[in-house]
Amino acid sequence: MSIITDVYAREVLDSRGNPTLEVEVYTESGAFGRGMVPSGASTGEHEAVELRDGDKSRYGGLGTQKAVDNVNNVIAEAIIGYDVRDQQAIDRAMIALDGTPNKGKLGANAILGVSIAVARAAADYLEIPLYSYLGGFNTKVLPTPMMNIINGGSHSDAPIAFQEFMILPVGAPTFKEALRYGAEIFHALKKILKSRGLETAVGDEGGFAPRFEGTEDGVETIIAAIEAAGYVPGKDVFIGFDCASSEFYDKERKVYDYTKFEGEGAAVRTAAEQIDYLEELVNKYPIITIEDGMDENDWDGWKALTERLGKKVQLVGDDFFVTNTDYLSRGIKEGCANSILIKVNQIGTLTETFDAIEMAKEAGYTAVVSHRSGETEDSTIADIAVATNAGQIKTGSLSRTDRIAKYNQLLRIEDQLGEVAQYKGLQAFYNLKK
């Protein structure tokens, strides 16, 4: 009764109006699962391949009909007949069917859509929530949210190099209250921006994209918003960055060129100067997490940054690790970073995603489950964050339904877990000396 009888993919749109995949999996019992695939704007060069059509006459070349065809005509034939509960076997079968190291033949987007839909169908068959199916009886930790309330870099037209300025409501007693803290700060920030005559339009991830005078101006404005909402910076709420440094790293000159986003007169920093600058910001402001502070291929820079700041700040590898256990394993051995960002479409299956989270935890690294800038209404990452007791999630600002869908799902999960639910707050940063 739990045998897969049909697999079907279609092309749908993501939050940027670009095509992506939606996959449906059906079983003999009538149990059903649907998965939608996100897409990134700033992508690591080592990520699994997102298969696009390349036909400029259709969606500017971004169509996904090739990936849709691969699901409907190749993957479906291979996995029909499998027990929908055998997630690992199905994921491994798709990896083998693709046969490339980066899923470039079938497309990570095709494979991931099926992987998510299979898990949802299995949960539906067992009549249990997705987080319970994926995580088992010990599922209980609601994640501390990283709320991206200022968008810069490749996610907006704002003249700021850093891609994300985030707030983390670590002092809240529950996830529900953490969400309230964030929403109140978001609205306080909007009032401050309006009072300064700055833009309040939002970027890809729902954060504001104003023309600040620089990084420090952005941070100080966020601190003012935290205080205006009635909270204490560095106690109730901390600040985090996603520098997305690979987006402004000049490989030929081996410098971090802030002029790419901030214009003429902006800083151009060596790796050592980049580390000095990040340390300066950490010493000046209540910053608890920095993502991709160095370029994805700057292993020496990552090691030096970790030696300098790794005991006091969470240093998250996104483009650096691309949710890949090979890169994470090397980072652990070489003492680079102390946390990994988990993006399901960087690696392409739920099985490999869970492998990366497990490896990180075993090494004492934290794991931050994350969205992409091109999202959908699919809320699977909320269930993954709780299923793995990851303790942290990054899923955008307090606007745009594609972001709020994940927060609302976490509210439902917290309600369903009842007294068992735990919100760790600051304890989610278990590898830092507080």
Swiss-Prot record:
Its cofactor is Mg(2+). The keyword Cytoplasm applies. It is found in: Cytoplasm; Secreted; Cell surface. Mg(2+) binds at D242, E291, D318. Keywords: Cytoplasm, Glycolysis, Lyase, Magnesium, Metal-binding, Secreted. GO terms for molecular function: magnesium ion binding; phosphopyruvate hydratase activity. GO terms for cellular component: cell surface; extracellular region; peptidoglycan-based cell wall; phosphopyruvate hydratase complex. Its EC number is 4.2.1.11. It catalyses: (2R)-2-phosphoglycerate = phosphoenolpyruvate + H2O. InterPro entries: Enolase (IPR000941), Enolase-like_C_sf (IPR036849), Enolase-like_N (IPR029017), Enolase_C (IPR020810), Enolase_CS (IPR020809), Enolase_N (IPR020811). One of its GO terms (biological process) is glycolytic process. Pfam families: Enolase_C, Enolase_N. Belongs to the enolase family. HAMAP family: Enolase (MF_00318). This is Enolase. It comes from Streptococcus gordonii (strain Challis / ATCC 35105 / BCRC 15272 / CH1 / DL1 / V288). The lineage of its organism: Bacteria, Bacillati, Bacillota, Bacilli, Lactobacillales.
